[in-house]
Amino acid sequence: EIREHEFVAQTLLSKLSDLGETIRHPREIMDLGPLVHYHSAIDVELGKKETIDRLVSLLHPTPALGPLPRTSETLADLISWRHRLGCPLWFGSPFGLFQDGACEILVAIRMVHWLGKKVSVPSGCGVIEESRLVSEWRELRLKRESVRSMFGV
């Protein structure tokens, strides 16, 4: 899982480095109860003013949520497969706060979707060449169980 995290962090670092000076902070472990989640903060000192649309297009989807390499063709394939499988087209998004000339953005990779009395908790896992199927299924189960336990179901 560290390797999957590094794919995401390195991809974001590469995309953001075109905007200005970047600093990647040491990888940390976030304890989320039954889940362990890796977190790597990246600071960017923008060389010029950027639009929110530009920042979002660089951040989303990360390889944790979409294909790598991310091209218009691979994104179209992903959307097509999700549509055919009845999956949500997206289940994560950048979220940010702009204040006093500074911006803090994170990329949320979890989702809970309510529609009437129905609640959906889509989840996925990263699949890279070194992935082991048993570990990926376990990761999916733990993600879903953690959300269920938060809601007491």
Task: Give residue spans per PLM region.
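Contiguous alpha-helical scaffold segments within structured protein domains
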Residues: 1-81, 152
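Glycine-rich, small/acidic residue-mixed loop/short-helix segments
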Residues: 70-153
